[in-house]
């Protein structure tokens, strides 16, 4: 969810968005309405975000900041514990401080729920910091594939050199790789 404005229903309340996510895969029926048990569960989940959203359950999602919406979207995506969580540049549209908070939240949720995640990013620092395996692609080909201790000991400069060696050329834009 590259765009924090996607993944949620802007005209609906926070608790309504969470209710839709919680009922994903179920047949809609008369018991689909929000109840106190769901409300309490949603409040507890939102408290973990530490964004104050638990006190704004009836606020329209369209009134939230990009970071708040991205955090809410992450909660909605993981509420049913997916087999694979695909994160496609999920912090790209956020300022650095908010991106760091969303990445920290992402890491907590993945660790807590023991999720398998695939994070796509152009930010090499994030690629090195998060996850247990790093794959770099160029023109549809895998050029770098590192894991474990090898990944843990790499620096951004090491990674750039590995990539340049595998690609057979130097890169034009450090911004592309450094984020």
Name every feature range the model reports, one short phrase each.
Residues 10-24:
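Q-loop/switch helix immediately C-terminal to the Walker
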Residues 85-88:
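Catalytic Walker B motif of ABC-type/P-loop ATPase nucleotide-binding domains
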Residues 96-98:
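Helix N-cap at the start of a conserved alpha-helix in ABC-type nucleotide-binding domains
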């Amino acid at each position: 969810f590259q765009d924090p404005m996607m993944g949620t229903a802007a005209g609906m309340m926070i608790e309504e968005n969470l209710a839709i996510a919680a009922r994903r895969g179920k047949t809609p029926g008369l018991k689909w309405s929000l109840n106190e048990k769901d409300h309490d569960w949603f409040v507890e989940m939102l408290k973990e975000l530490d964004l104050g959203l638990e006190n704004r359950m009836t606020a329209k999602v369209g009134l939230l900041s990009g970071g708040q919406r991205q955090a809410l979207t992450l909660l909605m995506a993981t509420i049913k514990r997916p087999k694979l969580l695909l994160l496609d540049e999920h912090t790209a549209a956020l300022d650095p401080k908010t991106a760091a908070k969303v990445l920290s939240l992402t890491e907590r949720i993945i660790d807590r729920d023991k999720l398998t995640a695939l994070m796509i990013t152009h930010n090499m620092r994030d690629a090195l910091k998060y996850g247990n395996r790093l794959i770099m692609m160029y023109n549809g080909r895998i050029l770098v594939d590192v894991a474990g201790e090898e990944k843990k000991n790499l620096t951004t400069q090491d990674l750039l050199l590995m990539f340049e060696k595998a690609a057979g050329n130097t890169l034009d834009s450090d911004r592309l790789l450094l984020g």
